[in-house]
């Protein structure tokens, strides 16, 4: 399981009701179901990946989670997970409002576009950066939002959302190993992970 997913799993309490958005092949859900006895549901856009999840015995809906989340009542889940997907969302503020409505807490992970390797590429080549975390050319990337850890924290302050936990990590896109970054996070971390809740 990817390193960021390992961190996310460690933050989830046993027996929690979990919704995993963009759950991919279901690695996180399967782990949580097996090791933490969660009541887990996933939503995955890809028919192929959703079918794989179902083959693994997971409860997964195939569809656009931006629409699907609006069908759930307030507080339906203890935790909603949005892993490495926020940068592909056209209306992140609207989505987070919906997620904080249906989930008591929301865990978000995203690639840090301010990592030093991306900065150096822009500085020395003058071109859009391509890194292990951002492996696309500018013309074929699914990423439509450029987020840094600093940007996201500022957004949360303006938006009035409380950060319960946060971690900056250094890992490659599909790596099972990584390190926790404790200083100069916006410069040195490849990913940010945050647990959020509404301020009541």
Regions found by a protein language model. Give the residues of each.
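Class I SAM-dependent methyltransferase "Motif I" SAM/SAH-binding loop
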Residues: 22-24
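Conserved alpha-helix/loop element of class I SAM-dependent methyltransferases that forms part
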Residues: 1-15
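A short SAM/SAH-binding and catalytic strip from SAM-dependent methyltransferases
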Residues: 79-90
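S-adenosyl-L-methionine-dependent methyltransferase catalytic module, highlighting the catalytic core
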Residues: 93-101, 105-200
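Class I SAM-dependent methyltransferase SAM/SAH-binding core
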Residues: 31-68
């Amino acid at each position: 399981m990817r390193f960021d997913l390992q961190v996310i799993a460690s933050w989830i309490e046993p027996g929690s009701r979990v919704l995993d958005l963009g759950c991919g092949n279901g690695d996180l859900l399967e782990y949580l179901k097996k090791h933490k006895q969660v009541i887990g549901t996933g939503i995955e856009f890809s028919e192929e990946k959703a079918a794989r999840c179902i083959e693994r015995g997971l409860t997964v809906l195939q569809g656009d989670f931006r629409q699907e989340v609006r069908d759930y009542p307030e507080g339906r889940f203890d935790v909603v997970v949005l892993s490495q997907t926020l940068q592909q969302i056209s209306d992140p503020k609207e989505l987070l409002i919906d997620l904080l409505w249906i989930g008591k807490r929301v865990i978000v992970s995203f690639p840090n576009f301010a990592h030093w390797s991306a900065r150096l590429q822009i500085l020395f080549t003058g071109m859009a950066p391509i890194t292990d975390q951002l492996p696309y050319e500018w013309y074929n990337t699914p990423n439509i939002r450029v987020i840094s850890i600093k940007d996201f924290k500022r957004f949360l302050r303006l938006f009035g959302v409380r950060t319960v936990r946060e971690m900056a990590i250094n890992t490659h896109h599909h790596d099972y190993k990584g390190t926790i970054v404790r200083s100069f996070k916006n410069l040195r971390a490849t990913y940010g992970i945050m647990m959020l809740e509404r301020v009541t």
